[in-house]
Amino acid sequence: MVRRRQRLPEVDMGLVSFEDVAVDFTWQEWQELDAAQRTLYRDVMLENYRSLVWLGHCLAKPELISKLEEGFEPWGVAEATEQCLPGVRKWSAPVEKGQQSQEKYLRQVKIIKKNTPDEDKVEVENTYNVDSNCISNMTLKNEVCSRVFFQELVNPLLDVPLPTEAGERQSTEVPHDLNRTQEVLSYPKHFTHHSKDQYSQCCFQYFGPDEAFHTKAILTPEMFYVQETSRTCNNYDKSFDEVTIPAQYMTQLRKQTLGWNICHKIFPNKTELSNHDAMHTGENDDKCDYEKPIINKSLYLTKHQEAHAGIEPQAHKENIKFFCLDAELQTVDPELHGEKQVYECKVSGKTFRHQPEHISQQRPHACERACQAKEHGEAGCDEPALTQHQRLCTEEKACEGKACSKAFHHKSLLPQYQSARADEQQSDCKELMKIYFYVSSPTQHHGPPPPEKPFRCNDCLKTFSHKSQLERHQRMHTGEKPHECKECRKAFCHKSHLIRHQGIHAPEKPYECNECKKSFYLRSQLTLHERTHTGEKPFECKECRKAFSRNSHLTQHQKIHTGEKPHKCKECGNAFARKSHLIQHQKTHTGERPYECKECRKAFSRKSQLMQHETTHTGERAYECKECRKTFYLKAYLTRHQVIHQSEKPFECKKCGKAFSRKSYLTRHQKIHKGQTLSG
């Protein structure tokens, strides 16, 4: 039974097909278009096709639309080679023009029943004025499912002989021995799938000498006369026996194409030739050595036959997880022929027809990333690669640390971890036994951080947990300053110090203090400054309970208790706890006094001395004691004064235990003990 969308009138008005609104470019014109013009062309063609589909005037998807949807250019290799070989003889017959009009209306045919009886063919003949011989030659029958399909065109070479230089050849029939199924399974791909709908679209495909595959064959009937051999699905014996090509173009043609020696099919690139090669040799590039599941990359006919034969896509037998790299194979409905898919979840026992549903359903069963595959039947790894999935099932850890028995899936992580433990204690990490999948730093566990600090400084024997911390620390000993300010050429050992320094040169300082209206370049600088107004001191020394507003001040203070003095003067050998103290001390050897008073031109070696001196000119006393309202020039004076109100005496003599409120008092007192020692 044939459904007519509308009766074709005998006047000029008729059904609109995609070819009526399509815009064609020659190969030379297409090369002159830029990327934007090609994108515009693609968008316009796709929009026209969608409009025709919505109106019901385009049942079969044109080859041009299939190429544009997949991101390919509308020009195949055949047309490009035709432009490159202008001397090749072209052939056309009067019957070709008549068949063009027949082909135009055949695109509107739609099959309703699974079989097409003779009366339906007669109706097609009467409706569309198509010759009965064309109808018989255009129908193919599937012996398994009794589906009938039309071919898009009748081979124009069947009845019209063409003399060639090698002699006269012609073909009178086109046998289609497809063994178990004779369904037309070729490009465009969406026509190759069975549908459970009542109305199944025809698969219009031209089966002439230029049979369409994923890549259009370079030998077309318009260019060469080709005798076509029988098409069988046994080893894909599709071939072109004789081709009449002028000898002067054979060398150029061989350079531009890659051909397969068994079936003489020609491909535009090496990748497609390799894929086709594996089809003949039976090789499968993507296979699991453990289970050897098949990853089939063959054409659509083989895919359909596998559905009849019950062949499953590549499966992992251990947990019934399927890895199908050909998405088109999943769309063949096995229930149409009474077959059943065996997509089974080993945990829940559910079965699925389509692999994506099966995989998404199994993911919730995964306990954790590193759990064994045998425990739950499905590895909770999102990696699609079969070898990576197999590595979970076999519990393969190719790289193992000999010192602590830690295992790594990736070889690149092992030397990083071994170098971290090379200079430190070889403690046993068998308690952890952590498996690292994707860790940027293997020395950092996902759980609590390890107690050891394997990176040690050779100068001061200080240890660090990360190598970057050690490198940053060593700059303090070497004096290296790789970060330089482009404005004043001042160098810094840390990048954070450079960023903080660049605020001096910044024209805008967006962060302003609400108390004193002083502005800052960084938000962190404003936060530190605000603590001078609020008196907040969140950092407290655990030894003497002294608090500080900055963590750096606490770190410097703690060196008093530890006695650490890493900064040593090369001139006199004196050591200092702070680098700033060393710099100030070195100026006593050089005599440098860079800080000069603008009022009296007096110079000082320290900036604090200059600031203290400038208050004698201005009379400003910015620091006031909240207890007695006494003001001071410097904050240090205020701090020393506040000890009087607090009755605090933090400086204690180790000899006699006497305490003092100021360090200068303690220093003066210690001289008494030194004098007693010398006199004794």
UniProtKB/Swiss-Prot annotation:
Q: Which SUPFAM superfamilies match?
A: beta-beta-alpha zinc fingers (SSF57667), KRAB domain (Kruppel-associated box) (SSF109640)
User: What up-regulates or down-regulates this gene?
Assistant: Up-regulated during osteogenic differentiation.
Q: Does the keyword Zinc-finger apply?
A: yes
Primary location: nucleus
Compartments annotated for it: namely: Nucleus
Matching entries from Gene3D superfamilies are given as:
6.10.140.140, Classic Zinc Finger
A GO cellular component term found in this entry reads: nucleus
Q: How is it modified after translation?
A: Polyubiquitinated, leading to its degradation via the ubiquitin-proteasome pathway.
Q: Which GO terms describe its molecular function?
A: zinc ion binding
Tissue spec. comment: Expressed during osteogenic differentiation where levels increase from the first days of differentiation and remain high during the whole process. Highly expressed in lung.
- Zinc finger (C2H2-type) residue ranges? 263-280, 455-477, 483-505, 511-533, 539-561, 567-589, 595-617, 623-645, 651-673
One biological process GO term for this chain? regulation of osteoblast differentiation
> Which InterPro entries does the UniProt entry name for this protein?
KRAB (IPR001909), KRAB_dom_sf (IPR036051), Krueppel_C2H2_ZnFinger (IPR050826), Znf_C2H2_sf (IPR036236), Znf_C2H2_type (IPR013087)
Q: Extract the coiled-coil ranges from the record.
A: none
Annotated ranges, domain KRAB: 16-87
The lineage's top-level taxon is Eukaryota
Give the keywords, sorted: Metal-binding, Nucleus, Repeat, Ubl conjugation, Zinc, Zinc-finger
Q: One Pfam family, please name it.
A: zf-C2H2
The record's section on PANTHER family has:
IP01015P-RELATED
Q: Its biological function?
A: May modulate osteogenic differentiation, at least in part, through the bone morphogenetic protein (BMP) signaling pathway, increasing RUNX2 activation and leading to osteoblast commitment and maturation.
Q: What is this protein called?
A: Zinc finger protein OBI1
State the organism of origin: Mus musculus
